[in-house]
């Protein structure tokens, strides 16, 4: 296969070495577990967290005479994912046997797809950032292919002092292996790419992306070269199950390779693992080539064939994907690129926001969801599905601001009460006397008292009009934050004779 270099060197991405600049070349193989009640070739459950070897059929255990039967739902999920990646859907694909020995691979081979995968080339637009100015940079990452394959079981080395056990619950679970082109040039780009893939699949409902459960793993191929030069020898870092660790592993591995090359050495093509505790990669074994696996078509499975009508029917069912949703939020609600990017990054966040924003000021809703709700959730380590404040409650708080019942400051206090205690925001405002003061007579009295108590500040304010803000703050403090801020501001300026 000829690898085409589609990107020109970017000075921002280069790594300075002792003998000049270096460029990192990164390609990823992402293994995504298909959301399906049954495995790829058997009816065994795919439920996470079951007792060891509870979800194992005779097919999964490779008992003699047991034949695989394709799970059509897994095929549909692969096609949906391919469509979400704007990729070519191949109407004919073939399952192959990939031969290697692992104790947790009962068949002695893995059923995968080699020369004829179900999905061909596609593209993903990845937003890298934001930078210090809050700007994102969009890059296009090519998808080489997506193919279906079986997962292996799990070897357990911590259950007995002298023996290893094998759990076959994962054996035969359907995986989509999504292979990128070598279009990534930094750890940050790689992290953004995996994040985007996960977001797309969560929107599609084809993979839950729970890396802590092993539903999404990545093999990271890293090499370095002089800017614009020939591709270097790559090393593969296996089974990365954290987006943060992917970035750390790439940064370490690139510097390791640069140090070797600058000392006059050469890079060995090998498979490595990342030690998150030590923050370093280390060698596992020499890297296998395709011929080492002795691929051949699986004689127990016919080629997988379907027509364009089958693909079109699935395409009609696809939900709105993150890029389309982001464009719509920017166009229809006037959101900034930054705010829209944050809101569509997780489907659950986007769904929550759209419920809050329905029939309301989109920018105000975005501000509350991003800064107040997500900010508080991050502090306490909760996700939005478990938010103590529902979309209806947050929407009610926004309504109270817009109709002048409460000020922005009171709204912050009300949000904290709803977060901690629950309840209907409008009823809480009534029962706790939280309505803002709109009676101009009462506000004027408070303004007069503050001005009378601070004659020296009055003269300063007339010389320096920005001092009016100090008076506004004092009046708000005197009224317990209940005075209408705009009314206070107008009265202060009028009383001080400030334009």
From Swiss-Prot:
NCBIfam families: gatB, PRK05477.1-2, PRK05477.1-4, PRK05477.1-5
Reaction(s) catalysed by this chain's protein: L-glutamyl-tRNA(Gln) + L-glutamine + ATP + H2O = L-glutaminyl-tRNA(Gln) + L-glutamate + ADP + phosphate + H(+); L-aspartyl-tRNA(Asn) + L-glutamine + ATP + H2O = L-asparaginyl-tRNA(Asn) + L-glutamate + ADP + phosphate + 2 H(+)
UniProt KW Ligase keyword: yes
Organism: Mesorhizobium japonicum (strain LMG 29417 / CECT 9101 / MAFF 303099) (Mesorhizobium loti (strain MAFF 303099))
Protein family per UniProt: Belongs to the GatB/GatE family. GatB subfamily.
Subunit structure, interactors included: Heterotrimer of A, B and C subunits.
Keyword Transmembrane: no
Protein's recorded name: Aspartyl/glutamyl-tRNA(Asn/Gln) amidotransferase subunit B
Top-level EC class: ligase
Pfam entry (one): GatB_N
GO molecular function terms noted in the UniProt entry: asparaginyl-tRNA synthase (glutamine-hydrolyzing) activity; ATP binding; glutaminyl-tRNA synthase (glutamine-hydrolyzing) activity
Keywords: ATP-binding, Ligase, Nucleotide-binding, Protein biosynthesis
């Amino acid at each position: 296969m000829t690898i085409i270099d589609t990107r020109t060197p970017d000075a921002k991405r280069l790594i300075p070495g002792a003998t000049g600049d270096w460029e990192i070349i990164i390609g990823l193989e992402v293994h995504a577990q298909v959301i399906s009640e049954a495995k790829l070739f058997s009816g065994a459950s795919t439920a996470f967290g079951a007792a060891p070897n509870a979800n194992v059929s005779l097919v999964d255990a490779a008992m003699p005479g047991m034949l695989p039967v394709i799970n059509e739902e897994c095929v549909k999920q692969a096609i949906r994912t391919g469509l979400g990646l704007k990729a070519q859907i191949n109407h004919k694909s073939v399952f192959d046997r990939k031969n290697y020995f692992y104790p947790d691979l009962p068949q002695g081979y893995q059923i995968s797809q080699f020369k004829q995968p179900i999905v061909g080339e596609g593209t993903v637009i990845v937003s890298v950032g934001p930078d210090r100015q809050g700007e994102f940079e969009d890059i296009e990452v090519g998808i080489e292919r997506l193919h279906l394959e079986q997962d292996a079981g799990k070897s357990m080395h911590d259950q007995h002092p002298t023996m290893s056990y094998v759990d076959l619950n994962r054996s035969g679970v359907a995986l989509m292996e999504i292979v990128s082109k070598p279009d990534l040039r930094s750890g940050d780009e790689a992290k953004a790419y995996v994040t985007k893939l996960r977001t797309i699949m969560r929107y599609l409902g084809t993979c839950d992306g729970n890396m802590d459960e092993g539903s999404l793993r990545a093999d990271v191929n890293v090499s370095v070269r002089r800017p614009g030069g020939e591709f270097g020898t790559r090393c593969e870092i296996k089974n990365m199950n954290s987006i943060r660790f992917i970035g750390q592993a790439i940064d370490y591995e690139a510097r390791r390779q640069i140090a070797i090359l600058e000392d006059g050495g050469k890079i060995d093509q090998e498979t490595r693992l990342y030690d998150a505790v030590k923050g370093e990669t280390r060698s596992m074994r020499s890297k296998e080539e395709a011929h080492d696996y002795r691929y051949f078509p699986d004689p127990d499975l016919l080629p997988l064939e379907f027509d364009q009508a089958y693909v079109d029917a699935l395409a009609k069912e696809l939900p709105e994907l993150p890029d389309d949703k982001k464009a719509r939020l920017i166009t229809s609600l006037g959101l900034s690129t930054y705010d829209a990017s944050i809101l569509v990054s997780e489907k659950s966040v986007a769904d929550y926001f759209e419920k809050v924003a329905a029939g309301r000021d989109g920018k105000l809703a975005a501000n509350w969801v991003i800064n107040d709700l997500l900010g508080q959730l991050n502090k306490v380590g909760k996700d939005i599905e478990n938010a103590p404040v529902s979309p209806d409650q947050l929407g009610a708080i926004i309504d109270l601001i817009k109709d002048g019942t409460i000020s922005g400051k009171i709204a912050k206090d009300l949000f904290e009460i709803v977060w901690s205690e629950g309840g209907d925001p409008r009823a809480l405002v009534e029962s706790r006397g939280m309505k803002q003061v709109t009676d101009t007579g009462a506000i004027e009295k408070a303004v007069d008292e503050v001005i009378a108590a601070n004659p020296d500040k009055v003269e300063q304010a007339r010389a320096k009009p920005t001092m009016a803000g100090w008076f506004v703050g004092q009046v708000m403090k005197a009224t317990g934050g209940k005075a209408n801020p705009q009314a206070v501001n107008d009265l202060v300026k009028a009383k001080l004779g400030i334009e």
